[in-house]
Each structure stands twice: as C-alpha cells, then as structure tokens.
Amino acid sequence: MVKMNMTEKILAEAAGLREVTPGEIIEARVDLAMTHDGTSPPTIRTFRDIASRGGPARVWDPERIVMVFDHNVPANTIGAAEFQRVTREFAREQGIVNIFQNAAGICHQVLPERGFVRPGMVIVGADSHTCTYGAFGAFATGMGATDMAMVFATGKTWFMVPEAMRIEVTGEPEGHVYAKDVILHIIGEIGVDGATYRSVEFTGDTIESMDVSGRMTICNMAVEMGAKNGIMEPNRQTLDYVRARTGREFRVYSSDEDSQYLEDHHFDVSDLEPQVACPDDVDNVYPVHRVEGTHIDEAFLGSCTNGRYEDLKIAAEVIGDRRVHEDVRFIVSPASREIYLKALEDGIIETFIRAGAIVCNPGCGPCLGAHMGVLAPGEVSIATTNRNFRGRMGDPASSVYLANPAVVAESAIEGVISAPQQEAGNGC
C-alpha cells in the first residue's frame, strides 16, 4: 500500500480513491466553498453563464457556501456597493444563509471562528490566502472565479495532486520573535517560487507548541512561496478551538511515517531575531537590525495574517502609555468583530486610541490598498500583512515592509523601523 502524507490522504478520501500519487489528476468532492465581496460577482456571472448553457440553475448545496464581505467594507465606491448588492441578491435567490456582511470580519478569520473549518475537510476559496485553514489540518486552497462557479454548480473540482515539501521547525524563539518571523525567515530562504504548486507540511516541536493564532499566520503565508496549500497536523489547542465552535464530527489525518517528500527543510529558530521583508518582494527578508532607522509614514496592524487578538495584545503591550509618532498614521484593524469586542473589553483598543492610533472596522482595505489607509507616491508603510509587491498598499511609487506586530507597534511610536526594547517572554 502506498504511504501517503496528510494532503494526499485528504484528497484520496475526497476523490473516493484508496490512494493518490503526485501528478495524478483527480476530481474531488468539496466540503466548503467561500467567496468574498470581490470574487462573488465574477463567480456569480460565470455560474449564470453555465446555467444558460444547460447547467444547474441552483447551487449544489447552499449550506456549504459561505460569502463574506471584507475587501471593501463599508463599500467605498459605487462599484463596490454594486458588487455587494449583486452578491446579496444572489444569496437570497439561492438560499445561501451563510453570508457575513457589515464588517463581521475577514473571511479567513470568520470561517474558523464561526465553526466552518474542521480537520480533514477540502475547502476552496476564491481568495489566494484560503491556505490559512491548513492550520486546522484541512486541505485548503484558493481558486479563480471560473473554477469556483463550477464548484457552486457541482460541488466538485479537479486537482493535480501536488508534490510535497516538509518543513520542520525546531527551537524556542525568545523575546519579540513570533510566528510571523518564523514564516518570513522560511520564505526568505526558500524564495517566493520555491514551493510552487507543492503541498507544504509544517512539522517540528515549534509548530507543535504554537497556538492557533501563530499556526494560522504560518499557513496563511504558505502561498507566498508558491505553495498549493500549507498544512499542519492539529495540536491539542487547535482541536480544542474547533470543538468549542462546532459540534460536527471530523477526522484528523496524519502523514504516514514513510510518506515521501520531494524536499525536506529544517529550520532552528532558537536564535532567530525579528525579521522584516523589504520592498518589493516577500522573500527579500533581513533581520530587523539591518533596516532599523528606515523612515515610515504609516504603520498597519491587522489583516488575515496578524489581526487576531494575540497580535493586538502584543502590540498594545509594546505601546504601553506612549504616543504614536506625530508623522505616522498608525492604523489598526482587528480581523473580526469578535476580536474587536474582546480587545475592547480588555482595554486593548483603548490603549491604541489613547496612543493616537486610528482604529478601523474589521476588513482587508489597507492590505490591498483599497481604502482606510492608501499610500501616496513615495510613502513608506510597515505592516503585519502578507504581501509587499510594488503598489500593493497604494501608489506604485510607495513601499511596504512586512514585520511582526511588536515591530510594527514600536515603529509606529518611533517614526522609523525599530525593534522593541522591552523585555518579552518566549515568542511564538
């Protein structure tokens, strides 16, 4: 019998096969499909086109489709408002009740938080960072509107079974070193195309001990090295998180001991210092001391990568009772309403407001340069987001540095890229 890794086992089950091998083309059952306000309308148009050619006029299962408004919330243009209107009407017509509007949160936070994500699932999303759900032991990947329209119609999609890459992470980071630094370091070594169309499996004692927030950060950025998906075997914290949010059954898959990997990589992060991805590539990574003193105009704390409660708490502790630098716009956007409320209750939002930060509703706006913090020509941002290519957060002549929440918070205070000086416990 062929030895299989986690991804292969999940895909084999979804395809109704005993085993699959890399390079094999399969048709797989989809457990959950997600679109957001930017990708729902093109998916809907293609779905209707399929229906006009004799395809299904109704979605395969309205309970397995989730729609989230997060990219332009509240709508910042007439076009965005129209996209959202079209999506609302389609959801109403098709009986899709799982539609989250009015700044409920970023899709990749809302889905796990609301109990839609479980180990062993096949999840597809019309967004490249759908790979985030691999943190829960699911096979999750992004796709375009055409493929998603076929999923809406049939509940199935095709995959080429990916080659696998195993990344073992060991060691206990110290100080202000977190999951963001770990994944930036990995991408810096492997490169933005070093894992193209590969299933990246994260293992090792660092991953095993990492909390849910950190694990989501790692898997979220797997696509930034070209991966088809990132995946981890769920640890106890992850299983507790899932069970607290859903009573539905699930199956946890583990890789066979002798399963094959195209590549194996090992990273010891014991002595890692905070990392910064410099313009204009995510793999242009250096230790923070190499770029300290770089002027910034904006600091952004949020996104599906680092907008969780743990991230906000780290930043608030770094800020304390200090004030944001007078020349810096410090923008904070919690990843969901649930996170926002908890941060309010615990005084974290008050810390940001008293420091002079701009606290926005949950959403993706600043990350993709859509609204709530667009950069002008020549401006520089340091952000907890996942991409920094030219023009990502605004004008093509602007620049973006990526860093962890502590570095972003300290930089907002100092007005230049800075490493936190305060003592911190063990990272990750």
Curated annotation (Swiss-Prot):
- Single GO MF descriptor: metal ion binding
In which family does this protein belong, per the annotation? Answer: Belongs to the aconitase/IPM isomerase family. LeuC type 2 subfamily.
Give the lineage. Answer: Archaea, Methanobacteriati, Methanobacteriota, Methanomada group, Methanobacteria
List the pathway annotation.
Answer: Organic acid metabolism; 2-oxosuberate biosynthesis
Write down the chemical reaction(s) this protein catalyses.
(2R)-homocitrate = (2R,3S)-homoisocitrate; (2R)-homocitrate = cis-homoaconitate + H2O; (2R,3S)-homoisocitrate = cis-homoaconitate + H2O; cis-(homo)2aconitate + H2O = (2R,3S)-iso(homo)2citrate
E.C. code: 4.2.1.114
List where this protein forms a coiled coil.
none
Keyword Iron-sulfur recorded: yes
**Cysteine-cysteine disulfides:** none
The name of this protein is Probable methanogen homoaconitase large subunit
- Quote the Gene3D superfamilies the UniProt record gives: Aconitase, domain 3
| Role summary | Component of a hydro-lyase with broad substrate specificity for cis-unsaturated tricarboxylic acids. Catalyzes both the reversible dehydration of (R)-homocitrate ((R)-2-hydroxybutane-1,2,4-tricarboxylate) to produce cis-homoaconitate ((Z)-but-1-ene-1,2,4-tricarboxylate), and its hydration to homoisocitrate ((1R,2S)-1-hydroxybutane-1,2,4-tricarboxylate). Is also able to hydrate the analogous longer chain substrates cis-homo(2)-aconitate, cis-homo(3)-aconitate. These reactions are part of the biosynthesis pathway of coenzyme B.
Question: Which Pfam families would you find in this protein's record?
Answer: Aconitase
Checking InterPro entries in the record gives:
Acnase/IPM_dHydase_lsu_aba_1/3 (IPR015931), Acoase/IPM_deHydtase_lsu_aba (IPR001030), Aconitase_4Fe-4S_BS (IPR018136), Aconitase_4Fe-4S_dom (IPR036008), HAcnase/IPMdehydase_lsu_prok (IPR011826), Homoacnase/IPMdehydase_lsu (IPR006251), IPM_dehydratase_rel_enz (IPR050067), IPMI_cat (IPR033941)
Subunit info?
A: Heterotetramer of 2 HacA and 2 HacB proteins.
Give a GO biological-process term.
L-leucine biosynthetic process
- Sites binding [4Fe-4S] cluster sit at 304, 364, 367
PROSITE patterns per record: ACONITASE_1, ACONITASE_2
